[in-house]
């Protein structure tokens, strides 16, 4: 990762702390993974603060495949099976079956309907019968251990929510360019400046978590 491009956002610790502040305020953040991995940037919001306007931005400015990152415990609570029995995707992205709220939606695809589905899935008393399957929201199961176990956007999202003191559930979507290609770091930084969103990397989150572990030891 060309960290020099991120220098205006401070060092790794500063970038993570800026992201946590933004998430607590209900704002979005942009997270870029390793260049030798997907080399993509995701726009991430906390699920509990998610608004219809934010969902519309995800649909309009990103790939449109809006994913809901959940802990293993929440996936079990909702009884969401894996999308496939044999996951052969390159990075083992842990999609479950897609979901839809059973109450309060129409076709399920509008920004408002997708927000309703996400709020139903993260409710404290959520139960499997609250959700229809399949639907237009794509849950992702985060690995226990977060980015220290798997350096993916799914784990990065859950780690950020936990570090921010928020409900451990987040919404993400890959940022794309106007021509449909995937946005890389220069375009993601420009997107962040346009929308006043902090930019950070998975490596930043790894460094931040390791620094906390060192302080605790």
Curated annotation (Swiss-Prot):
Mg(2+) 1 binds at residue 38. Pathway: Cofactor biosynthesis; riboflavin biosynthesis; 2-hydroxy-3-oxobutyl phosphate from D-ribulose 5-phosphate: step 1/1. InterPro entries: DHBP_synth_RibB-like_a/b_dom (IPR017945), DHBP_synthase_RibB (IPR000422). It holds the Pfam family DHBP_synthase. Mg(2+) 2 binds at residues 38, 153. GO terms for molecular function: 3,4-dihydroxy-2-butanone-4-phosphate synthase activity; magnesium ion binding; manganese ion binding. Signal peptide: none annotated. The record marks 136, 174 as: Essential for catalytic activity. GO terms for biological process: riboflavin biosynthetic process. Binds 2 divalent metal cations per subunit. Magnesium or manganese. Its EC number is 4.1.99.12. It catalyses: D-ribulose 5-phosphate = (2S)-2-hydroxy-3-oxobutyl phosphate + formate + H(+). The keyword Magnesium applies. It is an enzyme of class 4 (lyase). Keywords: Lyase, Magnesium, Manganese, Metal-binding, Riboflavin biosynthesis. D-ribulose 5-phosphate binds at residues 37-38, 42, 150-154, 174. GO terms for cellular component: cytosol. Its cofactor is Mg(2+); Mn(2+). Homodimer. PANTHER family: 3,4-DIHYDROXY-2-BUTANONE 4-PHOSPHATE SYNTHASE, GTP CYCLOHYDROLASE II-RELATED. HAMAP family: RibB. Belongs to the DHBP synthase family. Catalyzes the conversion of D-ribulose 5-phosphate to formate and 3,4-dihydroxy-2-butanone 4-phosphate. This is 3,4-dihydroxy-2-butanone 4-phosphate synthase. It comes from Shewanella loihica (strain ATCC BAA-1088 / PV-4).
């Amino acid at each position: 990762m060309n960290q020099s491009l991120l220098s205006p956002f401070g060092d790794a610790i500063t970038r993570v702390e800026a992201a946590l502040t933004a998430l607590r305020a209900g704002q979005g953040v942009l997270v870029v993974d390793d260049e030798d991995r997907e080399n993509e940037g995701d726009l991430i919001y906390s699920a509990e603060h998610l608004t219809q306007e934010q969902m519309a931005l995800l649909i309009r400015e990103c790939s449109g495949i809006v994913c809901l990152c959940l802990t293993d415990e929440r996936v079990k609570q909702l009884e969401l099976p894996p999308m496939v029995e044999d996951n052969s995707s390159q990075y083992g992205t842990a999609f479950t079956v897609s979901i839809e709220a059973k109450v309060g939606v129409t076709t399920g695809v509008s920004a408002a309907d997708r927000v309703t589905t996400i709020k139903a899935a993260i409710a404290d008393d959520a139960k499997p019968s609250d959700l229809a399957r399949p639907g237009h929201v794509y849950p992702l199961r985060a690995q226990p251990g977060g980015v220290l176990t798997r350096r993916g956007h799914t784990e990065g999202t859950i780690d950020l929510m936990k570090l921010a003191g928020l409900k451990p559930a987040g919404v993400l979507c890959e940022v794309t360019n106007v021509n449909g290609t995937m946005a890389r770091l220069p375009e993601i930084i420009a997107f962040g400046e346009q929308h006043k969103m902090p930019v950070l990397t998975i490596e930043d989150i790894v460094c931040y978590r390791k620094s906390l572990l060192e302080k605790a030891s």
